[in-house]
Curated annotation (Swiss-Prot):
The lineage of its organism: Eukaryota, Metazoa, Ecdysozoa, Arthropoda, Hexapoda. The gene is dec. Its main location: secreted. Residues 493-788 are annotated as: 12 X 26 AA approximate tandem repeats, Glu, Met-rich. Required for proper assembly of the eggshell. This is Defective chorion protein, FC125 isoform. It is found in: Secreted. GO terms for biological process: chorion-containing eggshell formation; egg chorion assembly; response to starvation. Pfam families: Dec-1 (PF04624), DEC-1_C (PF04626), DEC-1_N (PF04625). Sequence repeats lie at residues 493-518, 519-544, 545-570, 571-596, 597-622, 623-652, 653-680, 681-696, 697-720, 721-733, 734-758, 759-788. Residues 1-19 form the signal peptide. One of its GO terms (molecular function) is structural constituent of egg chorion.
Length: 1208
């Protein structure tokens, strides 16, 4: 039973988590639904670890900033982590009630809420208190497991279905009704904690209850509501198991609110079990709240027959608004029967971890209970003394059986200041006593294992995911086909599905055009062209309504235009050009003959033709901004032409100008057009075909064209007067053809030009033309390549079809995007390779440092997941945390030569910096100036491993993969790809790059064969790296099996001559090579800035000394009050400045502004002041300069010595 109770929770959790990850839906409620029933995901998806990890808060030691909370987290690491990540796991479920949606049971209970008139039913407390609803709980729990699918997630729609399905569940109602009492005993067998009913239901039955549950709850609740309350039902253990599920039903708003509070993100999905109920069934929220207190009491009374403990649990549960017990993930024992056979080693390991975690949580809960009990006693004794009633504050924890404690209980307990104080005290005591051990463990005593192996984020995720999965698997087996019934229905609620549905509708539209495209991109064009025209009309209507189709529309318009010209193209690109060309020629000739006779008339006529065409296109074009430009342009051109045509004939000049402008425009246009075509059509491979065809080989085409042109030349000569018009007309006529035409026109122009005297101008034209055709050729090639990579293209095309809009935006980028996308594909493939753990792979250790931090390098492949600091796993792989000072062992003042303590700040020998501080691992010691500089010069203090993984993978997928190495394997897969393991090291740091690059790929037996530093490794030389988690050296910050660098065990570096202790002057004596690395420069500047900021005067003084302006400005502290206000106290003195003391250095030109100082009341200072300050009056010309300035800066300078005098 326990299993079952857990399962539902787990399922919920899973769903929840999945929802959070990607379940297919964004809102938890749907989540659950989708998880269970969506067609796509029949199984509840167990969120992948990456997903979960992605959502996890980082696992740093929890520093809330609230000392008491910190103490709590320190004392109860496991609990803390549960609470902290609760939001992730069962999400609401762990920490909050399982929303009804999620709770299959909840669904049932919803119904109950609807149906139930019993006081009890109504009173269901948010806590889904089993006590109030033992029945509900019992039912729910069993249901939960069944639900595990969370099919019932979507309660609203499903309630009906559940009821419909109830028949399948008849047993459950029986269970609920009749068995309910029975279950209490039953649960014990199943798993004492789970709800009794569940056992009765038995796993198979349990799944059914899911659907029936609502009915059951409804009927049973009504019939048996009280039964459930019977002590029998209440069997404590069953309650424990069940209470959680039970919680779901209560619709307490407050639960929802709590959730909102705690998991703001989740709220909507599962407002709270209670909220959810209401939401799902539209039951007006159950008015549980008011009855709550009394109902609880009544229940308590009923239960008083049960052990007190249960009573307490119930109360506690009532209090827990968050209905899922923290221990929801307890491993149900029953699971093992089904699961064990399949369990892989990894699963078993995780399960062991899960159990360990569970044990830890239980231990912590017990301790918390004790603390709470103490607090309670303290409070009651205090109250007794004060005559207060002792019980004003309820202490839920001590009464709540451990397995039922929910987050709410803990929160409530922590609200009590006594509890907080006790926790704090205890934490302090612990810190004092165990501090030493802890520190050692954390720092690095070899033997010390950190006392509590705190789980890393990944572990927790792994465990939780495992718990879900187990529950899930159970559920899957039992998951009714019911889910499928709703799958379709649910898809609709599921945002993801919504998207799909919407998308499919769009697809339907798009398909009219694109079915062919999809089936056969190549054929597509022909077929599409033929069909296109018809469709274009349809589309255009749709298109206007459907922005999504914009692009399509543009494309189809172009298609339409293209079609006329290009059906032929398709069959014979070359022919097409000729034909088209000849058509154009025909037109051109007509025009041109006229042109010759009457240029003006021709223009008009041509213009009208253009207009006609433009109008045809333009209706479409209007929708197509690109075309707009053209149209606009063509209109402008038309105007221009009227003027310019005359000019052309009168003076070639005019022609030249417009032509240039025109040419430039046409090139731009060509480019734009190209980009546009590509953007719009590349997805559909259109342009490629087309362009490829029409520039099969730009040179060839050009020759062809030239030949044609030559033929046409005769006809064309007339055109010469009007090349521009012609071009224009054609452009306007058909953007798609524009480029060809541009070419042809440019050619015509060229050829005419050759005949004409325009040669020089034409030369330019030619050059441009040639260049353009070259560009075209390049683009063509690229496109061709892209075509060859068609698989990619297809993908891309498909994508483009799916997101026409993005394609639009990306249009211009399309080319670039495609190239990178190919590259990216390769990279991805590489990455996939890389993901199989390389032996020597090193991964970035902390995202913040990604670029610069040193990386763990598992050079000898002694595996272990590089990404994890799990103590509990097999040997924790070397984790060298050079990044921030993690818990450190107290600094040892050793003045001997500490091995490598000279980090930046430490004196060269002295205290080794706290152990993890940045670089003081004995790993690099830079002793002389040169070395220091060198170290600075390689700016990364540790080697950088250039790691091809995408950053996203850091915590997640990698870790998943690697953590599956069963401990038994001696070494993870040999390092197959040494080349990816490129480590750039600073020389002092370690095996030279060459060593690493060429390190023989590892021998599976020995790990990678590497140059071991003999001195370092000697004792281990003979040992193969057999991983044993408990090997003491695995507890070291570095693993003898992974020497960080070879050699280096000696001190002679410190003794060698010529290598002096680093001199710490800011500017070292002679940096031998006079190098100033950016790093040094930055440091110097920073020092300078700081100094300047903190000691402005001193800085100024030093600066002046440096520059030989000796100006001393001292601003002594003013002891009295500064009496500036009395400025005029000694008016007379000013007149005769006293020249004695300051005179020599005093600037003679001081301004009166300084007088304020002189007038200080205390006579002595004044005297001096006067001396100093009064001189200014003497000569007032230059005084403004330095003295005034400096004076203004620092108000009170008793001596303001200025350059002026000094230099005198």
């Amino acid at each position: 039973m326990r299993l079952f109770s857990l399962l539902p929770l787990l399922a919920l959790l899973v769903v929840q988590a999945a929802g959070q990850s990607e379940v297919t839906s964004d809102d938890p409620a749907t989540d659950a639904g989708s998880t269970t029933n969506s067609t796509t995901d029949t199984k509840p998806r167990i969120p992948s670890q990456d997903e979960i990890l992605g959502q996890m808060p980082s696992i740093n030691p929890i520093r809330t900033g609230n000392p008491q909370m910190d103490a709590f987290y320190m004392m109860f690491p496991a609990l803390g982590s549960l609470l902290k990540w609760g939001s992730l796991f069962p999400a609401y479920s762990i920490l909050g009630a399982i929303p009804d949606n999620l709770q299959p049971t909840a669904a049932a209970s919803k119904v109950v809420l609807v149906l139930a008139d019993d006081a009890t039913a109504k009173t269901r407390v948010a806590r889904q208190n089993p006590p109030p609803n033992p029945l509900g709980q019992l039912m729910n729990w069993p249901a939960l497991p069944q639900d595990f699918q969370l099919p019932s997630m979507d309660l609203g729609p499903q309630v009906g279905s559940f009821l419909a399905q109830l028949p399948a569940m008849p047993t459950v109602p029986g269970l609920l009704g009749a068995a309910a009492p029975v279950p209490a005993p039953a649960p014990a067998p199943a798993a004492a904690p789970p709800p009794a009913p569940a056992p009765a239901a038995d796993p198979p039955a349990a799944p059914v209850p899911d659907a029936p549950q609502p009915a059951i709850l409804g009927q049973a609740a009504l019939q048996n509501a009280f039964t459930f309350f019977n002590p029998a039902n209440f069997d404590a253990s069953s309650l424990l198991g069940q209470s959680v599920p039970t919680f779901a039903p209560p619709n307490l708003d407050f639960v929802a609110q709590m959730q909102r509070q705690f998991f703001p993100g989740m709220t909507p999905a599962q407002p709270a079990a209670a909220g959810t109920d209401a939401q799902a069934s539209d039951i007006s929220e159950v008015r549980v709240r008011p009855e709550d207190p009394y109902s609880q009491e009544a229940q308590m009374k009923i239960k008083s027959a049960l052990e007190m403990e249960q009573e307490r649990q119930q109360q506690a549960q009532v209090k827990d608004q968050e209905q899922v017990p923290l221990l929801w993930f307890r491993m149900p024992t029953t699971q093992n029967q089904d699961a064990t056979e399949e369990k892989t080693l990894e699963d078993l390991r995780v399960e062991a971890k899960l159990r360990a975690f569970e044990r830890q949580v239980i231990a912590e809960l017990r301790m918390l209970q004790k603390i709470e009990l103490m607090a309670k006693q303290m409070r009651s004794s205090a109250a007794a003394q004060n005559g207060d009633s002792p019980y004003r504050i309820s202490y839920p924890l001590s009464r709540t059986p451990i397995h039922k404690i929910t987050r709410a209980d803990i929160e409530q307990a922590l609200r009590d200041d006594y509890v907080r104080r006790l926790v704090n005290k205890e934490a302090q005591r612990r810190a004092r006593n165990s501090g030493i051990n802890t520190q050692k463990a954390n720092a690095l005593k070899r033997q010390a294992k950190s006392q509590d192996q705190t789980l890393s984020k990944e572990d927790i995720v792994q465990i939780m995911a495992y718990a879900y999965r187990m529950a899930n698997e159970q559920m899957e087996s039992e998951k009714g086909k019911q889910d499928k019934v709703y799958a379709a229905y649910r898809t609709e609620q599921n945002p993801m599905m919504m998207q799909q549905r919407q998308w499919s509708e769009e697809q339907a539209k798009i398909q009219q055009n694109q079915q062919q495209i999809q089936q056969n991109p190549m054929m597509m064009q022909q077929r599409q062209w033929s069909e296109e025209q018809a469709k274009i009309q349809q589309n255009q209507q749709q298109i206007q309504q459907n922005p999504m189709m914009m692009q399509q529309r543009q494309w189809s318009e172009e298609q339409a235009k293209i079609q006329q010209n290009q059906q032929q193209i398709q069959q014979n690109p070359m022919m097409m050009q000729q034909r088209q060309w000849s058509e154009e020629q025909a037109k051109i000739q007509q025009n041109q003959q006229q042109i010759q006779q009457n240029p003006m008339m021709v223009q008009q006529r041509q213009w009208s033709e253009e207009q006609a065409k433009i109008q045809q296109n333009q209706q479409q074009i209007q929708q197509n901004p690109m075309m707009m430009q053209q149209r606009q342009w063509s209109e402008e051109q038309a105007k221009i032409q009227h003027d310019q045509q005359m000019a052309q004939q009168m003076a070639q000049q005019g022609l030249m100008m417009t032509e240039q402008r025109q040419r430039q425009w046409s090139e731009d246009q060509a480019k734009i057009q190209q980009a546009q075509q590509m953007a719009q059509q590349t997805p559909m491979m259109m342009p490629q075909m087309q362009q490829r065809q029409w520039t099969e080989d730009p040179q060839m085409v050009q020759q062809m064209q030239q030949r044609q042109w030559a033929e046409d030349q005769t006809r064309m000569q007339m055109a010469q007067q009007n090349p521009m018009m012609q071009q224009q007309r054609q452009m306007a006529e058909n953007p798609q053809m524009m480029q060809q035409r541009q070419w042809s026109e440019e050619q015509t122009k060229i050829e005419q030009a050759q005949q004409m005297a325009q040669q020089n101008q034409m030369m330019m034209q030619q050059m441009q033309q040639r260049q353009w055709s070259e560009d075209q050729a390049q683009i063509q090639q690229q496109q061709r390549q892209m075509m060859q990579q068609t698989p990619m293209m297809m993908k891309e095309r498909q994508w483009a079809e799916e997101n026409p809009q993005s394609v639009q935006q990306q249009g211009p980028m399309m080319m670039q995007q495609q190239m990178p996308s190919m590259m990216q594909r390769e990279v991805e493939d590489e990455d996939n390779k890389a993901e199989d753990d390389l032996v020597g792979e090193a991964g970035p250790q902390m995202p913040e440092n990604e670029g610069t931090a040193r990386h763990k390098v598992d050079a000898l492949g002694v595996g272990g997941n590089k990404r994890k600091k799990s103590k509990s796993k097999s040997a924790p792989p070397t984790v060298i945390n050079y990044y921030y000072a993690a818990p450190q062992r107290p600094v040892v003042q050793s003045y001997g030569t500490s091995y490598g303590g000279g980090g930046y700040g430490s004196n060269a020998y002295g205290v080794p910096r706290p152990v993890n501080s940045y670089q003081s691992q004995g790993y690099r010691a830079a002793v002389g100036n040169d070395e220091v500089d060198e170290m600075l010069r390689q700016h990364q203090t540790m080697a950088r491993t250039i790691n091809p993984k995408q950053p996203g993978e850091v915590g997640g997928s990698e870790s998943q993969k690697s953590n599956s190495n069963p401990p038994t394997t001696l070494t993870p897969a040999p390092q197959e790809q040494p080349q990816e393991h490129r480590v750039h090291k600073s020389p002092s740091s370690a095996p030279s790059e060459t060593e690493i690059e060429n390190a023989p790929s590892s021998d599976p037996q020995v790990g990678s064969i590497f140059t071991y530093g003999e001195g370092l490794l000697h004792p281990f030389m003979g040992l193969l790296p057999v991983e044993r988690p408990d090997d003491p050296w695995n507890q070291k910050p570095y693993d003898p099996h992974h020497p960080l660098y070879t050699g280096g065990g000696s001190y002679d570096a410190y003794l060698r001559d010529g290598r002096h202790r680093r001199d710490t002057h800011i500017m070292g004596q002679g940096t031998q090579h006079g190098i100033l690395t950016p790093g040094m420069l930055e440091r110097l500047l920073r020092i300078k800035m700081d100094f300047q900021r903190r000691f402005p005067h001193l800085y100024k003084g030093m600066l002046n000394h440096h520059t030989n302006l000796t100006r001393v400005e001292v601003q002594p502290p003013v002891l009295g009050k500064i009496s500036k206000p009395k400025t005029k106290t000694k008016p007379k003195n000013e007149d005769e400045p006293v020249f004695e003391l300051g005179a020599a250095e005093r600037s003679l030109f001081e301004d009166e502004t300084n007088d304020s100082l002189e007038k200080d009341p205390e006579p002595e200072p004044d005297e001096e002041d006067d001396r100093d300050v009064e001189e200014p009056s003497e000569s007032s010309e230059p005084r403004g300069f330095s003295s005034k300035k400096s004076r203004d800066e620092n108000d009170i300078d008793y001596f303001n010595f200025d350059d002026d005098d000094v230099d005198d």
